[in-house]
Amino acid sequence: MSKTFVEVAESVGVDEKTIGNVFKDYVALKEREYQFETPKWLGIDEIHIIRRPRLVLTNIECRTIYDIKPNRNKETVIQRFLEISDRTYIEYVTMDMWKPYKDAVNTILPHAKVVVDKFHVVRMANQALDNVRKSLKAHMSQKERRTLMRERFILLKRKHDLNERESFLLDTWLGNLPALKEAYELKEEFYWIWDTPDPDEGHLRYSQWRHRCMSSNSKDAYKDLVRAVDNWHVEIFNYFDKRLTNAYTESINSIIRQVERMGRGYSFDALRAKILFNEKLHKKRKPRFNSSAFNKAMLYDTFNWYEVNDHDITDNLGVDFSTLIKNLEKGDL
């Protein structure tokens, strides 16, 4: 998989179509050979490969890639779920607010709890604040507009993360622009909702925030966020069960961009195979000791210590994020 179909075809003297057919057989073989362990906490996200959004499934607990599919259509998600024989093992599914994902989970994994990724929600608060900032530019001098644009990142950072200089600049802007101050405080208070570990406190904080927001001059800027939380309330607040997010999968897109740069001329299927079927990228672990099976074997005198202590048996958890990143940095994939 280190060469494109065209390069292989030229080197062995056959046409590109023949190489493509051989590759399909190879992929089918590897699909059977590498059966990744079903995640207890499944992440659904998307990555852009060859200019299109693709479905990526991750194991949140183990920080691995579980699978990558050519599109994120509801039918594709449903079909992939149906291929998981032990899908009842899945307890939580994290996602963004893409309804086809939710519909697919409710259809095939009705026992699993849907969790909307918190970072997709709080990002909307940042977008609302930035929209207020943009609306104020019309009343500023050209110098003020340039300065506010250059320092917009200060507005988007959490207040407790600002250094002394940034805090001074923020106070200056908010002191001169009351509308920006109000929008900024709403952004900070929305983030504050997710700082508590207590779900009841989280609900209370949101209720108070929503009331203040709808009574403010910034309500139009935040209306999309309010509507999203109203429509996905249960799934958003399921976050407090385990505080699960897809945060680490944000690195996927940068990873894939590196893969694409290294593999100009590759098809989606070839890039997918380079990632999923590269055994040196796989994270493995010894299975947990099955005490009930051990006790049963002892009871019926069928105990075999070699089978229980088989060092060759491992669980394949998928493509490890950290290993993938390290190999890409070395140009080794």
Predicted regions and their residues:
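Short alpha-helical "recognition helix" segments of helix-turn-helix
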Residues: 7-12
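Short alpha-helix plus adjacent loop in nuclease-associated cores
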Residues: 121-142
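Acidic/histidine-rich catalytic cores and adjacent linkers
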Residues: 51-53, 61, 86-111, 115, ...
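Short, acidic/turn-prone active-site loops that include or flank metal/cofactor-
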Residues: 70-73, 117-122
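Short, amphipathic alpha-helical "recognition" segments used to contact nucleic acids or chromatin
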Residues: 1-3, 195
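Non-catalytic alpha-helical coupling and interface elements of nucleotide-dependent molecular machines
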Residues: 1, 13, 24, 28, ...
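RNase H-like nuclease fold core
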Residues: 15-104, 111
